[in-house]
């Protein structure tokens, strides 16, 4: 499974599996989708005294969603182009683009939570989400809490995006089912990742087995398996 990931990444880097146009479409669409979901709408009953914090969380959702290789989204699009019928490649592209973006939004949710679990100060050279929110509220506890909720909102957003995209495709139930399976496997993988930290260091073979098991559940499930 590790070899599969390495080969896919190598293909993407050396053979140009996807064009710069794909990347531009992915980036702009992710921002559009995330903004629509997390930004309080005019008819949302948000107390005026709380609006600044709600707006800060919405802005951080966009900031956290920016950047990255977009390997998962690119692999989703390339899988679609490789296996879809010719007639579907144009008709279904917009829906598949949204589905690809949903995978990336879920990754962002996982990274926001990862940074809280790991107590990380930085993500992609900028303050991690919970650190940025702590700075804005002048409270580490509130920042962590808002970071947890931001991760939850992005995870929910990813399901909403995937569901809306799937409704425009055939076999929509299977698409949503695969997406939810990905969610479940990554979440189990995070539990296993934390469990490995409790393993004794005097059994290196078991450490290797447990670590590879984490890679299968937490990394491969949404980096290659789900996009393919």
Task: Please describe what each predicted stretch is.
Residues 1-103, 108, 112, 119-140, ...:
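Conserved N-terminal diphosphate/IPP-binding helix and adjacent helical/loop segment
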Residues 94, 142-146, 215:
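Short alpha-helix boundary/capping segments
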Residues 115-116, 122, 181-185:
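Short glycine-enriched loops at secondary-structure junctions
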Residues 131-159:
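Multi-pass membrane catalytic core of lipid/isoprenoid biosynthesis enzymes
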